[in-house]
Regions:
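Intrinsically disordered, low-complexity Pro/Gly/Ser/Thr-rich segments with frequent PxxP/GP/PP motifs
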Residues: 100-136
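Secreted, periplasmic, or luminal enzymes acting at the cell surface/secretory milieu
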Residues: 1-87, 93, 113, 118, ...
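C-terminal edge beta-strand
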Residues: 164-166
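Short, loop-centered acidic/histidine patches that primarily coordinate divalent metals
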Residues: 95, 129-131, 154-156
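Alpha-helical context
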Residues: 32-37, 42, 92, 102-104, ...
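Short acidic, flexible loop segments centered on an aromatic residue
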Residues: 83-100, 106-108
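Short glycine/proline/serine/threonine-rich loop/turn segments at secondary-structure transition edges
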Residues: 132-148
Length: 169
């Protein structure tokens, strides 16, 4: 117990074999035989254990509205609220809320590993670029579509601590 591990999973572990493969974008619903798909996972992408706890706060979005070729900066504060020093991997996910093609529910667009002493806090910043917002449209062209995007910052793909949104014009 002298060392606090801070590793994170680089894959998702499904609850059942029937969920595999699920490495493609899909819309929720039933299968061809009318059975409803099992939702949820055993261990989500980015999951990890720690002997301490972390609190996320103060999400700041540099611009609520951006153009398709603009960068955006996001930041938040992470504080070690436990009694041990530890590493945290702060993960940034986005979602195109109304895309013209089916996309993933959320996509990892950045992560930052930090080491904090008990009671210490640190501001974490991420930069979103047009490349990170784009998708391949139905004409097989890479584009940044106008519309609303959701921002999710957390400790794993399911343990989302902060949420926000912005718009691309």
């Amino acid at each position: 117990g002298d060392y606090n591990p801070g590793g994170r999973l680089a894959v998702t572990f499904p609850k059942s074999v029937g969920q595999v493969p699920f490495a493609f974008p899909f819309k929720p619903g039933s299968d061809s035989k009318g059975r409803v798909r099992v939702d949820g996972v055993l261990y989500p992408f980015g999951y990890g254990l720690s002997y301490t706890t972390f609190e996320y706060s103060a999400l700041k979005i540099s611009k609520p509205v951006i153009g398709p070729q603009e960068n955006m900066t996001l930041s938040c504060i992470v504080k070690n609220t436990g009694k041990r020093a530890g590493d945290e991997v702060v993960q940034l996910y986005i979602r195109d809320d109304f895309s013209s093609v089916t996309t993933y529910d959320k996509v990892l667009r950045g992560f930052e590993r930090i080491h904090l002493q008990p009671g210490e806090e640190q501001t974490i910043s991420f930069t979103l670029t047009p490349q990170g917002l784009g998708l391949w449209d139905k004409n097989n062209q890479f584009t940044v579509e106008p519309g609303s995007f959701s921002i999710m910052i957390g400790a794993s793909s399911q343990d989302i601590r902060l949420k926000g949104s912005f718009e691309v014009q």
